[in-house]
Amino acid sequence: MSRIERIFAREILDSRGTPTVEVEVWTEFGGYGCAKAPSGASTGVNEALELRDGDKARYNGKGVLKAVKNVNEIIAPELIGIDALDQLTVDRKMLDLDGTEFKTKLGANGILAVSLAVAKAAASELDIPLYKYLGGVQAKKLPVPMLNVINGGEHADSAIDFQEFMIMPVGAKSFSEALRWSSETFQALKSLLKSKKDITAVGDEGGFAPNFEWAYEKHDLESFKKKTPAEIALDLLVDAIKKAGYKPGKDGIMIAMDCASSELYLEDKKYHFKKIEKVTNQEWSLTSDEMISYLEKLVNNYPIISIEDGLAETDWEGFTKLTQKIGDKVQIVGDDLFTTNPKFIKQGINKKAANSTLIKLNQIGTLSETVEAITMTQKAGWTAVVSHRSGETEDTTIADLAVAFNTGQIKTGSMSRSDRIAKYNRLLQIESELGQNAIYDGLEAFYNLNK
């Protein structure tokens, strides 16, 4: 037994220059852990609360001094003396202190940072990497990266309503090779955008945020309907993959999308392409069935292997229909739908509303609950995709988590911005440490599909 001796929280800044919580933990025998809470831009209604101060005179109301104070004055005194290796007790104590379903009293940003810092301190004391502390001898599978190279939606000031267009190097033989393929494709995409005199500035997650001015002679609704911005983005990705010297498809690089459709779903229960509506001053909306047909069309025309949040978080019936239609050949990922919450994941499994769960630690708020969500997902025969948030730090915990629980997939941004690259570099370190024991499944990571 090694007791927690000290816990200290402070306010720091994330990749957007917005405050977040950092927590340090020390144990009696020299263990030390430090963790930083991430933050999302598009959030699900059932996510655990990210506690903000609300003082408009300071950081536009986004300060986290309340969450920091809760850690230092409420959580820390209760955890001092508890065994650092007893993660369940640590997390349960914090859940009891908060006492609310969505951690609205103490804030999930503070609770999560403490939970992760304790785990890191325990691993430090045992002098083993975090992934081995959490996963033991089974922790040896490197994830297929899901790299966000074109940003839209809430993540960028671009013409694209869908939030993320990603590449997945499923044909690579190792994680390091997968990263090389991804980097070369990212640079090829940049070259293509430059040749079209488009913007090569990057969004929150390091992907490009093009305006596609070159793709449309007229900015009227019929032009956008004839070739949607999503199709322009997909065409670009296929061209970039080829330009980099790789095959679009199962033997090379496939494509994933995050539609973030909850952001498009309005009170009329239709999906509105808001950015197109703004440009054209005309309404363009789809019913749930029409959106499903549109996504099916994209899947039939492009090498797409994964679609996240293809429908809104309240459109459970639509998710079930989408999974029935294309779930045998495409990974249907629930993010806003499940918010890493075992309660909603169980509901999704029963309804057959998806075949994959996105795992975001700050959506649920503790390491123990995150592990429960991963375990429930995998037992159902679904995949679990460990994910970052759009507001990140240099914290690399999710890299260790993906390996610890052999999730096989990780979503952590593009090939730019050090807050994203830090996770990839950590995975390269882990691959090196594992040596010949390292496994990279590639296409086999999609065990939920009929390949």
Curated annotation (Swiss-Prot):
- Which superkingdom, per the lineage? Bacteria
Q: Which GO terms describe its cellular component?
A: cell surface; extracellular region; phosphopyruvate hydratase complex
Provide the residue positions that the database annotates as binding Mg(2+). Answer: D258, E308, D335
| The EC number(s) this enzyme carries | 4.2.1.11
Keyword Lyase on entry: yes
Where is the catalytic site?
E205, K360
Enzyme class, UniProt record, top EC level: lyase
Which metal ions or organic cofactors does this protein require, according to UniProt? Mg(2+)
Give the catalysed reaction(s), semicolon-separated. Answer: (2R)-2-phosphoglycerate = phosphoenolpyruvate + H2O
Keywords from the UniProt entry: Cytoplasm, Glycolysis, Lyase, Magnesium, Metal-binding, Secreted
Q: Name one GO biological process term.
A: glycolytic process
Q: What does this protein do?
A: Catalyzes the reversible conversion of 2-phosphoglycerate (2-PG) into phosphoenolpyruvate (PEP). It is essential for the degradation of carbohydrates via glycolysis.
Q: What is this protein called?
A: Enolase
The gene designation is eno
